[in-house]
Amino acid sequence: NKTADGVINAKDYVSEELKLGMANAKVSTTNVAISIPVTSAIIRVVTSPLMSDDELQKAIETDSLWENLVQLTDDLNEYSIFHQVISRNNKTNTMEILFVASKLSDVNAYSSIVKKAGLNPVILDVKCFTLKNAFDNSFKIENKANNALLEIGSEDNYLIIVHDNIPIITDIFLRPNEKDLLGQFDGNIQNTDTESVVRRYCMPLK
């Protein structure tokens, strides 16, 4: 598996495969949307004093808002930051903000892979939100409160639940051999190794 160590470590291979896939599918457009792994992003819902949109923008421009609300180990300038006001509460004089920070080095690396394949990245999003949007657009379910999205992959393993419009993301640690066992799991526990993985895997989901 040439991408076993991650897509970024197999740039040339992935670019060539993208070219081949686009040619085989006879896709003519070159504008594409790409998603980066959850592991390349910092996702938090933070509580802030209630502000208007103008006040929020001014606080962001001075860098004071994120420095006070989000303690990052690296310089803010090393991240591409997206934010969205989720809710405002006049009674408590607070508001909830979705904060998403992606390492610029990772953003540039994934963009370069796509560009090398002759494509033009026009939209970039974190994969968990891309999957959620695809789910929302594909399945017209009235009550989405009882639904969750689960991903097990080479780079990401997480569960995402949206409660009161707030995304709750739980990372799940799995060893490579455990991913293989779960990938083969068909609902019937056939051996003690599989049973052990399934039981441990289910614990963070409860």
Regions inferred by a protein language model and the residue ranges of each:
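Hydrophobic/aromatic-enriched cytosolic interaction surfaces used to assemble or bind macromolecules
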Residues: N1-K206
